[in-house]
């Protein structure tokens, strides 16, 4: 069973609630953390297949993969 940090759970919950891809900056703002910290956790979740991403211009948009379960 995979274990997630409190921040990873919050990120997945935000993405689930949004129902659409969100840019790194918006996720960071909702969590009151830096974009660098948000990106670090998002990249870890992406490596584990929990989220996907796409770069558009200067922004990177993130979404929860459909196979991912949100842990509250």
Residue ranges and their predicted role:
Residues 8-20:
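Short amphipathic alpha-helical interface segments
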Residues 36:
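Key DNA-contact positions within bacterial/archaeal DNA-binding proteins
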Residues 44, 48:
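Alpha-helical DNA-recognition elements
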Residues 41:
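Residues within the DNA-recognition helix of helix-turn-helix
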Residues 1-8, 23, 55-72:
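Short, cationic-aromatic polyanion-contact patches
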Residues 26-28:
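A short acidic, leucine-rich amphipathic alpha-helix
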């Amino acid at each position: 069973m995979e274990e997630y940090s409190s921040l990873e759970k919050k990120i997945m919950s935000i993405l689930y609630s949004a129902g659409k891809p969100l840019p790194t900056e918006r996720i960071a703002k909702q969590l009151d953390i830096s974009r660098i910290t948000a990106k670090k956790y998002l990249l870890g979740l992406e490596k584990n297949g929990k989220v996907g991403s796409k770069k558009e211009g200067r922004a990177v948009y993130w979404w929860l993969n459909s196979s991912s379960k949100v842990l509250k």
